A protein has these predicted regions:
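Hydrophobic alpha-helical transmembrane segments
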Residues: 78-90
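Juxtamembrane boundary at the C-terminal end of a transmembrane helix
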Residues: 125-137
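Hydrophobic alpha-helical membrane-insertion segments
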Residues: 35-49, 120-123
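Alpha-helical transmembrane segments and their helix-start/interface "positive-inside/aromatic belt" motifs
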Residues: 26-41, 110-117
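Transmembrane alpha-helical segments in integral membrane proteins
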Residues: 46, 89-104
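Active-site and channel-lining beta-strand-loop segments
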Residues: 53-81
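Cytoplasmic juxtamembrane regions at transmembrane-helix boundaries
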Residues: 99-122
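N-terminal juxtamembrane cytosolic/stromal segments of multi-pass membrane proteins
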Residues: 1-30
């Protein structure tokens, strides 16, 4: 049993070393640094806007979705506003993990995935802003 534990720890140590090497290799490409800085700034803006909406609401329920044709589609608790920035963070993490697997193949894929994450976070900021407008204007 001791050898099995030793092997598992050895594989975990090697996996951690490979992961660190892959992250450092990916961060060596300067556009990745710029993309990640912009992504984390946009996601921080997302979280701040969600906090502002949460703090501004004086009741327990908030309109979370509005359709022009049908009107209000979704009403929920105020804490559900934090789903929006969480989705942005999930997109950033998933795309970064995908980049760790394809980092050596193509620079185009790096720009595509991180650009998509930027676009998603911009749309999520617009979504939080629209939730604010629906509830307070």
């Amino acid at each position: 049993m001791a050898t099995l534990d030793h092997k598992i720890l050895h594989y975990l140590y090697l996996g951690r070393a490979r992961l660190a090497e892959a992250v450092l290799d990916l961060l060596g490409f300067w556009p990745v640094k710029i993309y990640l800085a912009l992504l984390f700034i946009l996601n921080a803006i997302n979280w701040l806007l969600a906090y502002f909406v949460n703090r501004s609401v004086s009741q327990n329920l908030v309109v979370l979705h509005y359709n022009v044709n049908l009107g209000v589609n979704l009403i929920g608790p105020v804490a559900d506003i934090y789903i929006i920035p969480t989705l942005g963070l999930i997109f950033i993490i998933i795309n970064f993990l995908l980049l760790l697997n394809i980092r050596a193949r193509s620079n185009f894929l790096i720009h595509l995935l991180l650009g998509f994450s930027l676009l998603v976070n911009l749309f999520l900021i617009a979504a939080i802003f629209s939730v604010y407008l629906i509830n307070f204007r």
